[in-house]
Amino acid sequence: MSPTPAEPIVTVIVPGRDVAAYAAEALASLQAQSLDAWRAILVDDGSTDATGALFAQAAASDPRFTVLTHPTPRGLGAARNAALDLVETPFVGFLDGDDVLTPDALRRLTATLTRSGSDIVAGAYVRLRPDETGGYTPGIVQPWVRAATEPERLGVSLAEHPDVSGNIVAWSKVSRVELWRRAGIRFPEGKLYEDQVVAQRLYTTARAIDVIPDVVVHWRERADGSSITQHKDSVAVLSDYLESMRAGIAVLDAAGHRAAVRARVRLILDMDVPPLVAIAQRHPDDAYRRALGAFVAELATRADAEDIALDDATVSLRSAAVLW
């Protein structure tokens, strides 16, 4: 028997392209939520596998699911934007079709916003990594995630909590739909890492921000290496990655949030740059090194101007990258 849905208060947008191997678990994590009052818009973005059929089956058995189909792939940004236009609930969140919500995620996120009156709440997340059994095991909360979400803070501004700027993923948050429409926020289309600039726009335009330390999402690292974040050795992927970080910093700059800029520059140099330098050192294409070197030089100049303290390892890698 199909469940009788409660009046929904939050819409979860679930884009997916060729995620048939993971979609059932993602959708089951929605149905296992302690909060019943949700609906989900499932966007099949031109899949060539059984993703569309799985989405359709879910919608046929549970009226809380609605399916939107793109006959040809348009990308995550376009998929999310198309679904955003259909949202009728007060709150909206996101879940990628290969990730997993923790059982109490929606209740905690929506209850926090209801209690505080803030525009957006960000929670913690962990990597879901392949294990020796052929399955996946969740990891620990990483330091930059803890810095953004611990301890719980309600009704703060970006100026009061600049480290929240390090939480740049779409799917660890719930926000008021009114915030998106008031500020005219849309995801960039035709680009990878499209959520980074959107996160900074949400933070800079929110009237108040909440953060909670609860792990709300398990973010999958696919065993077959097919997710976008596992292809940073591609020059094209690197280009979009660097541009997304530049664009996010530009949003913070334009809004006058110097402390958040400092926090973001430090985090990128400490966390994002070292693995990219390691890739560049063995990469066969000089274009990769030149692009990364130019980006690191920009951030190094900014770090020096802002007197941002960096650890010794980061300084060493920065020096190597600038020489490219």
Regions found by a protein language model. Give the residues of each.
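C-terminal subregions of glycosyltransferases and related glycan-biosynthesis enzymes
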Residues: 221-324
